[in-house]
């Protein structure tokens, strides 16, 4: 499904499988994309490009993989790719087993993501930008299978923020041959130190209320 230069449309209960891309919303406004399935696509599950005032909710995206994708060209498969300006809401979706869970570039910071699930993606987020971006709303963030924090008061919200695009992630992006170290005790310790001293504060995407 490809929306371009449209306004006020809706798409639901669709399935996209084994194709180049799932659902593309481009240069459009007030689109509702909900309760759809996308699996085994190559480039993206959901694309938001220069789209505004739209809602992407309760969709399930899995296994977006580009066998020819190159990190240096940002051509890997993305569960959701947000490119260009616009203020949109992305909530209640699941992005699983993709090359990249969410890609954000060139002014996509206005879109708010909360109450989504990012599970088993090789890289959870790739953000190309320098702004500080918050991915939670009213105390509700997202679920991250790679979150290494804790919830001591057992309220269902992590006690420390999750930064899926921190300095270590950017290092692994630049040097993919070092990915085998991602879950090592040393990297876990370095992430802890980075969080304690707020070394990455004000940089990139932050989920202050991971669930």
Per-range role (PLM):
Residues 28, 40, 73-78, 82-85:
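Short coil-to-beta transitions that initiate beta-strands within beta-rich domains
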Residues 107-211:
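Acidic, glycine- and Ser/Thr-rich low-complexity intrinsically disordered tracts
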Residues 83-92, 96-112, 119-120, 125-126:
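Membrane-proximal low-complexity regions enriched in glycine and acidic/polar residues
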Residues 1, 5-6, 11, 28, ...:
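Parallel beta-helix/beta-solenoid
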Residues 18, 75, 157:
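Residue-level signal for pocket-adjacent positions within structured domains
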Residues 1-4, 20-27, 42-50, 65-72, ...:
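Short glycine/acidic-rich loop motifs that flank beta-strands on beta-rich extracellular proteins
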């Amino acid at each position: 499904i490809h929306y371009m230069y449209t306004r006020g449309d809706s798409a639901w209960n669709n399935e996209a499988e084994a194709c180049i891309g799932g659902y593309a919303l481009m240069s459009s406004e007030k689109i509702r994309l909900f309760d759809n399935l996308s699996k085994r696509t190559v480039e993206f599950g959901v694309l938001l490009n220069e789209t505004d005032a739209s809602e992407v909710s309760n969709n399930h995206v899995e296994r977006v993989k580009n066998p020819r994708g190159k990190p240096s060209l940002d051509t890997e498969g993305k569960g959701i790719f947000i490119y260009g300006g616009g203020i949109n809401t992305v909530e209640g979706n699941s992005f699983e087993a993709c090359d990249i869970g969410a890609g954000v570039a060139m002014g996509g910071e206005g879109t708010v993501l909360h109450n989504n699930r990012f599970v088993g993606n090789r890289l959870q987020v790739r953000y190309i930008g320098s702004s500080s971006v918050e991915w939670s709303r009213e105390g509700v963030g997202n679920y991250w299978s790679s979150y290494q924090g804790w919830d001591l008061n057992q309220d269902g919200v992590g006690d420390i923020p999750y930064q899926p695009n921190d300095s270590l992630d950017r290092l692994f992006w630049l040097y993919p041959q070092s990915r085998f170290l991602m879950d090592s005790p040393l990297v876990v310790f370095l992430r802890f130190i980075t969080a304690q001293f707020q070394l990455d504060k004000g940089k990139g995407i932050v989920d202050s209320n991971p669930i």
